[in-house]
């Protein structure tokens, strides 16, 4: 499967103000107040723009865009989708108050193996039961390559993202992952259902695991609503900018990997090491080290 789409959007201040309101009370105050005079999109703000606006009839049964899923005529029947990893590249400022274009290339690839990859297995929810496995153990990866141009058709931002679609019904208990780095800076916050709903609305993202608790817990066996991947990425980038504002201005690339789902009402900790590594883990007051949710790296 391969598809191309061009998404046009006017880059206004309004979605950014709504993002600040969404993050207010969760991230440091400096994250909310540091952009009083910005004239261009900051790292991660492009997630607020260039969303597909498909009618409901074009969405999958879980509310997600069918364009980013395996083709309907494909015999692969996925049970769950997972955002695995991505790369953001920043070439030049993308200024506000102009019409910009995002060119997307969507490609599908099958990954056949006797068992799903470790990175996918680590993202599966815990369950009190195991159902019968499907006849074909297979994972499909959907690669989305995005190139964002300004009104002068200059390339400003590139984004690569990888989604995984699982063709198995049985659930695995994820292994606990821990960071080997020591945080030099950290911030703890507890995402709420309202925070997740607001961010999903800003992205025009109707994926039901983010806003429908009954669907998330009963249909996909998660313990609660799931945080969107872009929200985790944005939180890391915003906290990094608040700690290292000058370095953020010279950011050329950001690589990230999502290792385990994060849920509402679960305390999370954003960390930055002295070497520039970022990660999010489940914050705990227990003696056991917190387990990793996501990790990233800034390159300047």
Swiss-Prot record:
Coarse class of the protein's main subcellular location: mitochondrion
Keyword Lyase: yes
GO biological process, one term: fatty acid biosynthetic process
Keyword Cytoplasm: no
InterPro entries: HotDog_dom_sf (IPR029069), Mitochondrial_HTD2 (IPR052741)
Gene Ontology terms for molecular function: (3R)-hydroxyacyl-[acyl-carrier-protein] dehydratase activity; oxidoreductase activity
One Gene Ontology term, aspect cellular component: mitochondrion
Localization terms from the record: Mitochondrion
EC number(s) on file: 4.2.1.-
Keywords attached to this entry: Lyase, Mitochondrion, NAD, Oxidoreductase
Superkingdom per UniProt: Eukaryota
Function as written in the Swiss-Prot or TrEMBL entry: Mitochondrial 3-hydroxyacyl-thioester dehydratase involved in fatty acid biosynthesis. Required for respiratory growth and for normal mitochondrial morphology.
Similarity-based family: Belongs to the HTD2 family.
Protein name as it appears in the record: Hydroxyacyl-thioester dehydratase type 2, mitochondrial
Organism whose genome encodes this protein: Schizosaccharomyces pombe (strain 972 / ATCC 24843) (Fission yeast)
This protein's encoding gene: htd2
């Amino acid at each position: 499967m391969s598809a191309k789409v061009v998404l046009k959007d006017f880059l206004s201040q309004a979605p950014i103000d709504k993002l600040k309101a969404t993050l207010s009370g969760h991230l440091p105050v400096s994250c909310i107040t540091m952009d009083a005079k910005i004239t261009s999109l900051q790292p991660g703000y492009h997630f607020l723009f260039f969303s597909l606006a498909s009618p409901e009839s074009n969405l999958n049964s879980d509310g997600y865009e069918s364009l980013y899923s395996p083709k309907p005529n494909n015999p692969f029947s996925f049970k769950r989708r997972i955002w695995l990893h991505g790369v953001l590249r920043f070439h030049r400022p993308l200024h506000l108050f102009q019409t910009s274009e995002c060119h997307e290339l969507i490609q599908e690839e099958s990954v056949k193996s006797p068992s799903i990859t470790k990175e996918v297995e680590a993202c599966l929810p815990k369950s009190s039961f195991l159902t019968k496995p499907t006849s074909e153990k297979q994972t499909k990866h959907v690669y989305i390559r995005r190139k964002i141009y300004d009104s002068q058709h200059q390339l400003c931002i590139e984004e690569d993202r990888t989604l995984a679609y699982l063709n198995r019904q049985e659930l695995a208990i994820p292994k606990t992952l821990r960071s080997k780095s020591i945080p030099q800076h950290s911030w703890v916050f507890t995402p709420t259902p309202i925070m997740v709903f607001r961010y999903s609305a800003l992205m025009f993202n109707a994926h039901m695991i983010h806003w429908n608790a009954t669907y998330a817990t009963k249909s996909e066996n998660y313990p609660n609503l799931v945080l969107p991947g872009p929200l985790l990425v944005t939180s890391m980038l915003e906290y990094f900018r608040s700690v290292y504002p000058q370095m953020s201005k010279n950011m050329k690339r950001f690589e990230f990997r999502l290792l385990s789902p994060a849920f509402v009402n679960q305390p999370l900790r954003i960390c930055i090491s002295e070497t520039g590594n970022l990660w999010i883990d489940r914050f705990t007051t227990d003696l056991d080290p917190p387990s990793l949710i996501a990790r990233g790296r800034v390159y300047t």
